[in-house]
Structure formats: structure tokens, C-alpha cells
């Protein structure tokens, strides 16, 4: 799955072939087709695994009583951790979003809905507690998921710009970026 994720991230769904995946993974093409029923099955399995991992962490989070601001910080941490564990996922999802979800298996839509519902629930809790100002949950979802996905997907370009001296900074620590997003959201949502 690692080789396929790298190729889907780099070339997109359409630009990736089972032959290329087999070569990169050093496996027989027939094995991929047998285990995943082809390229689309493998693509779906990757996304199902990663969405499932995130949803399991969010379900654990819901069991703990905590304020909405802490819950939102944990949501950001879960997705930051996911993008660090699965480096190609960010680019895969951005490509999928740009294609209008053309290659997204319909069985994955409930996973995406549950991720959005987690944000919606956090926003509603924060407004009810009086700790968050009233914001659109869909905007909040795109703010959180979008900035994390872009940060991790843009790493190759960012690294190139740093190595070529275009940007004068050291490589950016993902944990610092996640903390930065958490702080921005906490301050930006705080009820005045």
C-alpha cells in the first residue's frame, strides 16, 4: 500500500497504473488484482484504512469528557498525526478533491460525513458552552482539513525552496505547525 500511496500522490489516480505499482512494490501485478480487485480497489482500501484510523481516534476522543476547545485541538492532532503517518494521503486527497471526487468509492462517503459531523459536533458544543463564537461548521471543517492537507502535501516544494535558498528557514517541524493551527483556531474561535 505504501508504493501505491506514493504513486497515487505523485501521479494521481488516472496517471497511476497497476504495472507501476507492482514495479514499485516489487510484487506481481496479479497479486494486486487478486487482493484488491484492481487499481480502484487498492485506492479505496488505502483511503478506507486511513479514514478508519482517524475515525477510530475520534471515537476514542468522544468518550472523554472535555471542553470543545480541547476537543478541537485533539481533532487537529489526530489529522496531523494521520498526515505524518501517511505522507502521500494529503496529495491523494487534494487530487481527489480537485477531480470532484471522481475516483472516490461511494462506500467512503459515510466516512467523510462522519469526519465532518465530528467538526460540526465540536463547533456546536463550543457555541453551547459559550467558548466559541458562532461559526459555520463546514467552513471550520475546510479550514482545519484544508490547511493540514496543504501543509503536508506541499512538503516537497517547501523542501526544494528551502534547499535552493528561495526561503531562508530550516525545515519546518510538523508538530510545530500542528501546534500553530491549534493556537490559531483557539484564538480565532474564542468568544469575545
PLM region spans:
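C-terminal peripheral helix-coil segments that are non-catalytic and often amphipathic
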Residues: 78-81, 85, 113-133, 147-192
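Helix-turn-helix
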Residues: 3, 7-41, 45-46
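Short, basic, alpha-helical segments at the C-terminal edge of helix-turn-helix-like DNA-binding modules
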Residues: 48-53
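Short coil/turn segments at alpha/beta junctions that flank glycine-rich nucleotide-binding fingerprints
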Residues: 10-14, 65, 86, 129
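Amphipathic alpha-helical segments used for helix-helix packing
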Residues: 71, 84-106, 155-163
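All-alpha amphipathic helical-bundle segments outside canonical DNA-binding/catalytic cores
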Residues: 70, 106-111, 127-143
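Hydrophobic alpha-helical connector segments
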Residues: 59-91, 137-144, 175-178
Amino acid at each position: 500500500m505504501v508504493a501505491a500511496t506514493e504513486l497515487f500522490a505523485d501521479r494521481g489516480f488516472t496517471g497511476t497504473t497497476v504495472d507501476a505499482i507492482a514495479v514499485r512494490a516489487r510484487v506481481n501485478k496479479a497479486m494486486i488484482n487478486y487482493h484488491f480487485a484492481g487499481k480502484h480497489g487498492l485506492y479505496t482500501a488505502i483511503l478506507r484504512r486511513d479514514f478508519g484510523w482517524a475515525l477510530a481516534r475520534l471515537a476514542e476522543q468522544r468518550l472523554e469528557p472535555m471542553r470543545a476547545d480541547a476537543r478541537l485541538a485533539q481533532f487537529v492532532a489526530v489529522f496531523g498525526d494521520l498526515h505524518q503517518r501517511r505522507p502521500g494521503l494529503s496529495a491523494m486527497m487534494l487530487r481527489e478533491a480537485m477531480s470532484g471526487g471522481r475516483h472516490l468509492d461511494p462506500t467512503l462517503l459515510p466516512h467523510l460525513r462522519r469526519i465532518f459531523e465530528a467538526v460540526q459536533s465540536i463547533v456546536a458544543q463550543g457555541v453551547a458552552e459559550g467558548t466559541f463564537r458562532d461559526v459555520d461548521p463546514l467552513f471550520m471543517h475546510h479550514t482545519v482539513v484544508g490547511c493540514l492537507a496543504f501543509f503536508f502535501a506541499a512538503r516537497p516544494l517547501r523542501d526544494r525552496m528551502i534547499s535552493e535558498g528561495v526561503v531562508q528557514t530550516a525545515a519546518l517541524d510538523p508538530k510545530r505547525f500542528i501546534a500553530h493551527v491549534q493556537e490559531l483556531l483557539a484564538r480565532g474561535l474564542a468568544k469575545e
